[in-house]
Amino acid sequence: MAAGSECLSRNGTRRDFIRALGTLGLGVATQHLVSRRVCARPPTGPGEPALQATLKVDLERQLGTIDPNIYGNFIEHLGRCIYGGVYDEESTLADSEGDRKDVLDAARRLHVTQLRWPGGNFSSGYHWKDGIGPKDARPARYDLAWFQRETNRFGTDEFISTCRKIAAAPYICVNVGTGTLDEASAWVEYCNRPGGTFYSDLRKKNGHPEPYGVKYWGIGNEIYGPWQIGHKNAADYAQMGLEFAKVMKWQDPSIKLVACGSGDPSWDRPVLESLLEQVDYISAHHYTVSDDPKDYYEVLGSVAQMEQIIRSSALVAEGLSARARKPTPVWTALDEWNIINNWADGSKRDDVHKFEIMYTLRDALWVASALNSIQRHCRTVRLANLAQLVNVIAPMQTSPTGLLLLTTFYPLELYASRSGNVALEVAAQSPRFETKSFADQPFLDVAATTDEQRQKVTLAVVNRRKEGDLLGSFELGGWKARPGGHAFQITGDNPDATNTFANPHAVTTQEVTLGVSGSRFQYQFPRHSISWLEFEVE
């Protein structure tokens, strides 16, 4: 199989970001590098019989409970994510408050559990008081993170309204770049105090008598990176972050705080040594970067890199929590993750059409494998956010007349709407592939879930083999599948298949026949496909 060109940075930095050279990024494009380098094996011919894999699923071997907060999303004042995306006052498709109804409907289909805002890089220069009060009186600013004019017509009150419409918990990231302790404390006061103080009464004056009860708060975004406004080293952030955490929790002790992490122990350890008793999560970001369709296997293998970031974050957090005998350990918040073609769009000044990627079937396979990984790491990953919801590296794109659901929308919908809440261990033996950066990767990537009553099993199976089908032989241990069930597939004519406004259904979810029963059964997984099997057990 062709390994393709090297789509991922090899230099070990968070992201190749040198503003003078015109390269920007949203998050960590690469992280700890895989040291073993090998060449990809030759491809098998398309006419050869299906390869075989064996998969053993035992309902007694549980990995842990899946936190519904892993199905979160993210909206940032970047490109057309907010204006022209979620919020479009001039659109005939908007409701009376300016929210695009078609975007809200699609977000409901994704079962977004919590929604992160206002950034992202944008948060490091955002002053929340600019975005409250009468809209026509709000000051317009020039955003130095993404080089766009910001009208501030979408602010805290509008964000809370949007969250409520899609039944998502709000997750606010405060400004630790140009922001102050007073500003962060006042924001919590505005959102969460019932009244009797200046900012809670200001919220009432603005037409919102009841407190918002915002539970999740992030203490800054990617402040470790030189691309960030107010960039700091770990020691400085650890000291400053502690003070932010103190005043925010003094305003409302019930809130959950997310420390700014990087997935790198050299940053995460000193940060958590300072903030351990104050925070509930530490963040990690991962983006796989590829602008070459030939990088098929290199891209799909890169999910292993995301898993390495998760393990690194969890190792530090769990170790320090155990040493301090913290009753509830600090969890990992993978609050930005996705696949992107390049970062060049970020440096385009005054261009609102940034990062509007037409995702392919290959990208949908990557998203499904990433979700499998997040589910398998459910013991430590308790919050996750796909970046972002609409138009910007997003599963949907708007036009003046409608909404397009891209290929990545469909695995997101399947996992959030049909997964069980308990992750199961899967012992899998699958044929493997290797690339320049990622060795010994299984063609068949699997996650299994059940419910607390162990009445139903779901199997999410990604066949990453481009050249042919894979025949999976399943064993359920002492359990039996009842006849019936449901099966869904996401596939297309080739890995480059994409949805467009002219051809919106090239890649969608299709229901197919599932004829399984007993403790052993077989299922043939089409090449480059996502298959979803669910059945009751006894």
Regions from the PLM with identified roles:
Residues H285-G301:
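Active-site His/acidic residue clusters
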